């Protein structure tokens, strides 16, 4: 039994199983025993097997024959076990001159042990003989058989085994004695500890008596603390060592988990790549759809702009018509006044009133058309605002989709780069592993080559010795033959009997010489054959070594190429990162440009909204002008007639409209005003105006309506410009110097300001409350709800109220 030195075998998988007593050659058809040792680094399994492989195998399937490895009895995990397998002779290979080796293969197909190479050769008489030096320190060589040599070795090993067993028994006895001593020492230590505790208790009791005992007690405490600290330190060291072992195990488990996670993440990344490709296609389709929608929205915006231009042209046209109608109305009022001055007949007044009513109907119709056009304009502006908002949201969605598409493309590129890098890493790892395997095989082949070379040198020495021995034997034989010839020549003439005897003796040395020559020739032939075989095997091994070197060079070149490819991939990854940074910068610039466009569009929308408000305010001012003209013309006539003393009697029944008012249903008011119908229109009394300018003539404002017309905003409720004329005729312009009408418009002011008391209101103050505050300063007629300025003459106001009770004036319900 050969002893072997323990080394850290966990570094190589081929050293987890060690094969013992492997010979250099075995008989082909004889039973073969395989001795091997299972190290603590392998866990046996019933499906493990030992196979005979030809040298140069690549996988576990290249076995020649195999036997199942038996499960060792009473196996303890982490211990070494010796096992034996017996291969039957008819399963073994023949004498083919190839090298074989034992390999231990696990149930997972992993090769965990390999033996030294050996051959299967038939025994020859020369091979059974061995030469060895004499143990008696003599220069002679002793020729023995292999069996004898092996028996001697077995006897020596058995003796060594017996000696080792005796030594083991002695060592076991010594260990038992040492264990008993350790137990005794531990008991003594425990006894001493108990005694120490007792002494400490006694010392604590005596501390109150003497100060010296206190000092000794402190010294004992210090010693005890040192011992305990050492014990704690040792315990901590033990705990740290155990923690390190546990950490190593956890690191191994974590590495396994990381490997599993990496495989799982690889599968997830492949799935994610597929999904991202699908999302990329969907993004492309969505991008195309959004571009189509953008084009549609742009076309709709263009059509709405065209409609807006058409509406503006229609509004300008109607404004021109309103101006023309105002001029016509002014001319008609002038004609009415001239007719009132020239004639006082009822028929003329009826005709003039009829014309005035028709003009008022036309003005009212145009006013309703203006209101409808304002509604349509507001609807068009709202539609345009909605389309602009939709366009803005579509652009934002488009930019968002583009950003997502760019991010997806970048992620795809990064994933592709990561996968390529992983592939290169795995390939590099595999190539390195193959190079290490080839280096190991080269080392094994070199060792085998050295052994064969040494054997060849030894055989060459034996051949030289045999040739020297044969030459010496030939020289001795020739000397003997020469001496014998001389003796024969000397005794020829003496006795014929002796000559006959010499003749009879002569053939015996020739036969011995012939036998010796035959034996030496046979040995020389066998030695030459063996030398030829050895040289052939040497050449084969040399060729294999050269092939392995060529393969190593080839793999080294491939490794260099793979490193170059990896560097190129790294450069490509850096370029891709730079491109991504440039794309991000361009995208940020595009975002800034889009923000500028959005800000420009918002400013444009604000300008459009301001223009819209200006248009509405202008329309409202035009409406107020028309209302002021319609209401101020009879009021001026009334005041002039009152001052001159002329009162015209009007019939109680108002004329009915010839074609009716087509906008009567839409002209309804809320509150106390009610609806204006032709038969319910009430006017103040009219008298002949006098053009004297001595007294102050006040043109009162029309009655203010507390309700808003349909389709108009709060900021555009019935307001009138302060600089607007009260009447279009020259007399009204002259009267403007004595009394002016009240008008305010809050759409142009940031804060609302009362024009009478100078009180400021916030911009978001309710318009109806603001109007109530302003109206509270005015004098209101309790009958007709007509408003008068605060500085209006009280007597004139009372006279106005009294006119409602006159018999010649229409009653106001």
Curated annotation (Swiss-Prot):
Keywords, in A-Z order: Apoptosis, Coiled coil, Cytoplasm, Cytoplasmic vesicle, Metal-binding, Mitochondrion, Phosphoprotein, Repeat, Zinc, Zinc-finger
GO cellular component terms attached to this protein's record: autophagosome; cytoplasmic vesicle; mitochondrion; phagophore assembly site
MF (Gene Ontology): zinc ion binding
Binding site for Zn(2+) 1: 754, 757, 773, 777
GO biological process, one term: apoptotic process
Family matches, as InterPro entries: CALCOCO1-like, CALCOCO1/2_Zn_UBZ1, SKICH, UBA_autophagy_assoc_protein
Coiled-coil ranges from the UniProt annotation: 144-627
Zn finger residue spans: UBZ1-type: 751-777, 778-804
Segments for region (Oligomerization): 320-420
In-chain residues carrying the UniProt-annotated modification Phosphoserine: 124, 138, 225, 617, 633, 690
Polar residues: compositionally biased ranges: 489-502
Pfam family name, one: CALCOCO1
Taxonomic superkingdom: Eukaryota
Residues annotated to bind Zn(2+) 2: 781, 784, 800, 804
Chain segments carrying region Disordered: 489-508, 663-738
Gene3D superfamilies registered for this protein in UniProt: 2.60.40.2840, 6.20.250.40
Subcellular location: Cytoplasm; Mitochondrion; Preautophagosomal structure; Cytoplasmic vesicle, Autophagosome
Primary location recorded for the protein, binned into one broad class: cytoplasm
Domain notes: The C-terminal UBZ-type zinc fingers function as ubiquitin-binding domains.
Function (record text): Ubiquitin-binding adapter that participates in inflammatory, antiviral and innate immune processes as well as selective autophagy regulation. Plays a key role in the negative regulation of NF-kappa-B and IRF3 signalings by acting as an adapter for the ubiquitin-editing enzyme A20/TNFAIP3 to bind and inactivate its substrates. Disrupts the interactions between the E3 ubiquitin ligase TRAF3 and TBK1/IKBKE to attenuate 'Lys63'-linked polyubiquitination of TBK1 and thereby IFN-beta production.
Subunit architecture: Homooligomer. Interacts with TNFAIP3. Interacts with STARD13. Interacts with MYO6. Interacts with TOM1; the interaction is indirect and is mediated by MYO6, which acts as a bridge between TOM1 and TAX1BP1. Interacts with MAVS; this interaction induces MAVS polyubiquitination. Interacts with TNIP1. Interacts with TRAF6; this interaction mediates deubiquitination of TRAF6 and inhibition of NF-kappa-B activation. Interacts with RIPK1; this interaction negatively regulates RIPK1 ubiquitination. Interacts with NBR1. Interacts with TBK1. Interacts with RB1CC1. Interacts with SQSTM1.
Protein name from the UniProt record: Tax1-binding protein 1 homolog
Gene name tied to this protein: TAX1BP1
